[in-house]
Amino acid sequence: MKLLEDRILKDGIVAQGDVLKVSSFVNHLIDVELMDECGKELYHLFKDDHIDKILTIEASGIGVACLAARHFGVPVLFAKKAKSSNISNSVYTAKVASFTHGNVSDIVVSKDFLNKGDRVLIIDDFLANGCALIGLRELCHQAKAQVVGAGIIIEKEYQGGGNKLRAEGMRIESLAKIKSMSVEDGIEFC
């Protein structure tokens, strides 16, 4: 998606440790117009898949998931990274390693909101090593819900997570795919 790629080149910051900072428009300060365009593009990619629900993980995926959900006319369910007192004891749970934060979290969703037969589109802001997608897919598997695919805003294609999951048969549509990235050379898209 050229609009997104142009914005990444303009305002994204490549930092040491293979980190792309897009906090000025994706995952801290949200450019609602841009994320709505991303949501619209994801709708066009998945509109024929009869989505019942969008699933994401807190916190950075929530904004774009909500904007995409407006186009699909479906609710958004987000996996929490910690079980809180306002969620029932009846939950699906999976472990997810975070590339950005360098830790492992237990993610949970209430069994009240993820149901057998649901047709789920997973949406997230980044795809690097694939751990978040694997965890979200596992929650759906536990619920006997069907993952119809994943919509990703930015994929670090060179880290291999997306290619591994595609090889397993998962449909993944990424709006911006980064072929390589470094502080010295900047960003090259696929």
Provide a role label for each language-model segment.
Residues 1-123, 127-190:
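PRPP-associated nucleotide enzymes
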